[in-house]
Amino acid sequence: MSRISILAVAAALVASATAASVTTTLSPYDERVNLIELAVYVSDIGAHLSEYYAFQALHKTETYPPEIAKAVFAGGDFTTMLTGISGDEVTRMITGVPWYSTRLMGAISEALANEGIATAVPASTTEASSTSTSEASSAATESSSSSESSAETSSNAASTQATVSSESSSAASTIASSAESSVASSVASSVASSASFANTTAPVSSTSSISVTPVVQNGTDSTVTKTQASTVETTITSCSNNVCSTVTKPVSSKAQSTATSVTSSASRVIDVTTNGANKFNNGVFGAAAIAGAAALLL
């Protein structure tokens, strides 16, 4: 019986050693890993309470879930109190104190090893990260290519538009120039045609008549010069005491210039009389001047 007992004890020891050597690999964010980390963290707070108080006084923004305070003073029975804390919050708290690397990290590693737990980033997370990086790189490349293509297209479009605008401007300029030349040519042609028509259809012939309209103001004399069939006639109307007499006589071509001069002189005198008849004794000066001019033709 003793041999059986010894063998049984030996088998139990071997089984225990085998069980202890079995390691379970878990994610750092697994709940069992988080609970082990929190257990070490709470125990460290209880053992170094004054350090944590001083740290919290210097870092007002470092907050702790109320479950941590309850666990510290629970006397070691706090496992169920910490199940609601997220993995990100656990990581923030344990790595936020200055003694994490010198004291907490080693204690957490030892506690995980005692439980047969090894932590590693899951393959799916790595693949997802790699895939995300690859997709991001591909998207960036595609975006860059798209941007370059868009920029090139915009540049080509702008160049094409500029070319079209330039061509349109050139065409418009050509059309405007052509239209201007056409209008100028048409106007010149019309002017030339009018001049030609005037020269051919309205020559100064012996049958045309030229007249000088008389100017009569306040009963003063007036002179009318008419040209008919190359003959110059001079008509002189003289008025005195409301009785007027008219004399018409032909003059030679030599006298024509004289008659024209008389007409011009008479017109000037009449103009003066018109501008102020009362200033010249009711036109007496004007009548005398016309009579004197008419005497030159007799």
Swiss-Prot record:
Q: Which stretches are tagged as propeptide in the UniProt entry?
A: 276-298
Provide the topology term for how it sits in the membrane. Lipid-anchor; GPI-anchor
Cellular component terms per the entry's GO annotation? cell periphery; extracellular region; fungal-type cell wall; side of membrane
**GPI-anchor amidated asparagine-type lipidated residues:** 275
Q: Which InterPro entries match?
A: SRP1_TIP1, Yeast_SRP1/TIP1_CWP
Q: What induces it?
A: Induced during anaerobic growth and completely repressed during aerobic growth.
User: Does the record's keyword annotation contain Membrane?
Assistant: yes
Give the residue range of the signal peptide: 1-19
Molecular function via GO: structural constituent of cell wall
> Would the keyword Aminoacyl-tRNA synthetase be found if you checked this record's keyword annotation?
no
Report keywords, A-Z. Answer: Cell wall, Glycoprotein, GPI-anchor, Lipoprotein, Membrane, Secreted, Signal
Record PTM text = Extensively O-glycosylated. The GPI-anchor is attached to the protein in the endoplasmic reticulum and serves to target the protein to the cell surface. There, the glucosamine-inositol phospholipid moiety is cleaved off and the GPI-modified mannoprotein is covalently attached via its lipidless GPI glycan remnant to the 1,6-beta-glucan of the outer cell wall layer.
Return one Gene Ontology term, BP aspect: fungal-type cell wall organization
Region annotation (Disordered) ranges: 122-168
List localization entries: Secreted, Cell wall; Membrane
PANTHER family registered for this protein in UniProt:
CELL WALL PROTEIN CWP1-RELATED, SERIPAUPERIN
Q: What does this protein do?
A: Component of the cell wall.
By sequence similarity, the record places it as follows: Belongs to the SRP1/TIP1 family.
Q: What is this protein called in UniProt?
A: Cell wall protein DAN1
Q: Which organism is it from?
A: Saccharomyces cerevisiae (strain ATCC 204508 / S288c) (Baker's yeast)
